Amino acid sequence: MKTLLLTLVVVTIVCLDLGYTLKCNKLVPLFYKTCPAGKNLCYKIFMVATPKVPVKRGCIDVCPKSSLLVKYVCCNTDRCN
C-alpha cells in the first residue's frame, strides 16, 4: 500500500511539472539557460542595420521598447528566441 501511494505521489509531481521555469537560448542557439524566477520572457536583440544577426539573447522580465538603432524581440515559450 505504501509503495502504491509513493508511486502516485511521484507520478503526480512529474505530471504537474512543479517548479516549471522558462528556458531561453543564449547567443549561440545550441546553448540555453533556465530563467530565474520572475524572468518570464525570452528576448533577442538586433541592431537595426543588421536585422539577421542577433547581438544578445537571454531572459528578461519586461520587454524593452525598440529604438532607432536596436530592435528587441520578446516571446514566452521555451527556446523561442
UniProtKB/Swiss-Prot annotation:
<protein>
    <recommendedName>
        <fullName>Cytotoxin 1</fullName>
    </recommendedName>
</protein>
<dbReference type="InterPro" id="IPR003571">
    <property type="entry name" value="Snake_3FTx"/>
</dbReference>
<keyword id="KW-0732">Signal</keyword>
<keyword id="KW-1052">Target cell membrane</keyword>
<comment type="function">
    <text>Shows cytolytic activity on many different cells by forming pore in lipid membranes. In vivo, increases heart rate or kills the animal by cardiac arrest. In addition, it binds to heparin with high affinity, interacts with Kv channel-interacting protein 1 (KCNIP1) in a calcium-independent manner, and binds to integrin alpha-V/beta-3 (ITGAV/ITGB3) with moderate affinity.</text>
</comment>
<dbReference type="GO" id="GO:0005576">
    <property type="term" value="C:extracellular region"/>
</dbReference>
<dbReference type="InterPro" id="IPR003572">
    <property type="entry name" value="Cytotoxin_Cobra"/>
</dbReference>
<dbReference type="GO" id="GO:0031640">
    <property type="term" value="P:killing of cells of another organism"/>
</dbReference>
<keyword id="KW-0204">Cytolysis</keyword>
<keyword id="KW-0123">Cardiotoxin</keyword>
<comment type="similarity">
    <text>Belongs to the three-finger toxin family. Short-chain subfamily. Type IA cytotoxin sub-subfamily.</text>
</comment>
<comment type="subunit">
    <text>Monomer in solution; Homodimer and oligomer in the presence of negatively charged lipids forming a pore with a size ranging between 20 and 30 Angstroms.</text>
</comment>
<feature type="disulfide bond">
    <location>
        <begin position="24"/>
        <end position="42"/>
    </location>
</feature>
<keyword id="KW-0964">Secreted</keyword>
<feature type="disulfide bond">
    <location>
        <begin position="35"/>
        <end position="59"/>
    </location>
</feature>
<feature type="signal peptide">
    <location>
        <begin position="1"/>
        <end position="21"/>
    </location>
</feature>
<dbReference type="InterPro" id="IPR054131">
    <property type="entry name" value="Toxin_cobra-type"/>
</dbReference>
<dbReference type="GO" id="GO:0090729">
    <property type="term" value="F:toxin activity"/>
</dbReference>
<dbReference type="Pfam" id="PF21947">
    <property type="entry name" value="Toxin_cobra-type"/>
</dbReference>
<feature type="disulfide bond">
    <location>
        <begin position="63"/>
        <end position="74"/>
    </location>
</feature>
<keyword id="KW-1053">Target membrane</keyword>
<feature type="disulfide bond">
    <location>
        <begin position="75"/>
        <end position="80"/>
    </location>
</feature>
<dbReference type="GO" id="GO:0016020">
    <property type="term" value="C:membrane"/>
</dbReference>
<keyword id="KW-1015">Disulfide bond</keyword>
<keyword id="KW-0800">Toxin</keyword>
<dbReference type="InterPro" id="IPR045860">
    <property type="entry name" value="Snake_toxin-like_sf"/>
</dbReference>
<keyword id="KW-0472">Membrane</keyword>
<dbReference type="InterPro" id="IPR018354">
    <property type="entry name" value="Snake_toxin_con_site"/>
</dbReference>
<dbReference type="GO" id="GO:0044218">
    <property type="term" value="C:other organism cell membrane"/>
</dbReference>
